A protein has these predicted regions:
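Nucleotide/phosphate-binding sheet-loop regions of phosphoryl- and nucleotidyl-transfer enzymes
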Residues: 1-419
Length: 419
């Protein structure tokens, strides 16, 4: 029997499940599992870790040939569920491409968002969303990410300048503005043209315009990143065998930057710092994933209590907080209610503190990923004990959750919270 290389997920169905980490990677297994328990996840598919081994054994061309029919069928499945078409001008489907090994590890390929855009599709997207700035901003981000990650233009050391960042600075300076979001549509068009010229100058090739050419480039870049220097070094340190390989997850894009009813954020089912059983997180209205962690805009708190605590620490009055930095609980109560229900569902399902990423596209909530959250030593102990007392785990599991090397943190002095 022909081995199965591509597993689809979407609309509450999935060919994979949580215990298939070895084959689908951590991310792919979780995306499948979330679908199966009724969490809204944008549809997509995962290419297995076995294919990564085939990639190194048989070579790139052979693997693309082996995958072609399965990937095209999986894309057609996403098109049906999202009611849009890959590479289509009038009603475009865009996708994200992510790497996902069984253990999360640095050095692996960064995520690529907005794949499927070109000069024609961006105009179609502009008309469809009635938001040209959003369409061109998505395109600008895509060319930059693809150039950095797939075409190898990202600087390898801190001293080198990222060619794309240099162009952004140059355009901002010429315009006399400080922030990226102060650039208008015409500026973004200029950026795209300059970005593509930089790609041609550095790689000798034009930026790929075909959606499938872009997709194959990104898929192969994930497999290539498995053998990059940082990844190899990390595996040596952690004792991870090279033959594990990485999976590739391709997923329909959902957009948090389609206006005031869209948002993006990250949240935790408990406090990762002190272990308090308090749902918390940050979000930004009209923004895309990276913006929350990039520090370009001040993210707002998800819960009202979190927002009030944050304002108190930052010396912001309650009037100012409500006017300028309202919590999601206050600004988007319906979405907040759904988010709160789903984070509880996920924590109960995985029986551990969850770190989740989500996007709201025009009033519809989508979960992008969930994983067991990283936590401090103190939080680790408190969460394990609380979960035990709440009947979610037994004593044996609680003990197994205590990492001995983290206990060392508890022996060091810490700042007094009340100080």
């Amino acid at each position: 029997m022909e081995r199965k290389r591509v597993y689809t997920f979407g609309n509450g169905k999935a060919e994979g499940k949580a215990d298939m980490r070895n084959l689908l990677g951590g991310k792919g297994a979780n995306l499948a599992e979330m679908n199966l328990i009724g969490v809204p996840v944008p549809p997509g598919f995962t290419i297995t870790t076995d294919v990564c081994s085939e990639y190194y054994d048989l070579g790139k061309d052979k693997v693309v040939e082996l995958l072609k029919a399965d990937v095209e069928k999986a894309i057609a499945n996403i098109e049906t569920l999202m009611n849009s078409k890959f590479g289509d001008v009038a009603n475009p489907l865009l996708v994200s491409v992510r790497s996902g090994a069984r253990a999360s590890m640095p050095g692996m390929m960064d995520t690529i968002l907005n794949l499927g855009l070109n000069d024609e599709v961006v105009e179609g997207m502009s008309r469809k969303t009635n938001n040209p700035r959003f369409a061109w901003d998505s395109y600008r981000r895509f060319v930059q990410m693809y150039g950095d990650v797939v075409l190898g233009m990202k600087p390898t050391n801190k001293e080198d300048i990222d060619p794309f960042e240099a162009i952004i600075e140059e355009v901002k300076e010429a315009k006399g503005v400080k922030l990226d979001n102060e650039l208008d549509v015409e500026d973004l068009k200029t950026l795209v043209a300059k970005f593509k010229a930089a790609v041609k100058a550095q790689t000798g090739k034009d930026f790929p315009t075909s959606a499938y050419e872009q997709l194959w480039g990104a898929i192969c870049a994930v497999f290539d990143s498995w053998m990059n220097e940082r990844a190899i070094l990390y595996r040596k340190m952690e004792g991870i065998p090279a033959e594990w390989g990485t999976a590739v997850s391709v997923q329909a894009m959902v957009f948090g930057n389609m206006g005031e009813t869209s948002a993006t954020g990250v949240c935790f089912s408990r406090d990762a710092g002190n272990g308090e059983d308090l749902f918390n997180g940050e979000y930004l209205i009209n923004a895309q994933g990276e913006d929350v962690v990039a520090g370009i805009r001040t993210p707002q708190q998800i819960t009202k209590i979190g927002s009030q605590r944050w304002a108190e620490r930052a010396g912001i009055s309650e009037e100012d907080r409500i006017a300028k930095y309202p919590s999601m609980e206050e600004a988007m109560p319906e979405i907040y209610k759904q988010l709160d229900e789903l984070q509880t569902k996920l924590e109960n399902h995985y029986r551990d503190m969850q770190d989740m990423e989500f996007t709201v596209q025009e009033g519809k909530l989508w979960f992008l990923q969930t994983r067991n959250g990283k936590r401090t030593g103190a939080a680790m102990v408190k969460i394990a004990i609380d979960l035990l007392h709440q009947g979610m785990i037994d004593e044996k599991t609680a003990l197994a959750r205590i990492e001995p090397n983290k206990l060392d943190e508890l022996l060091h002095p810490v700042f007094d919270k009340t100080a």
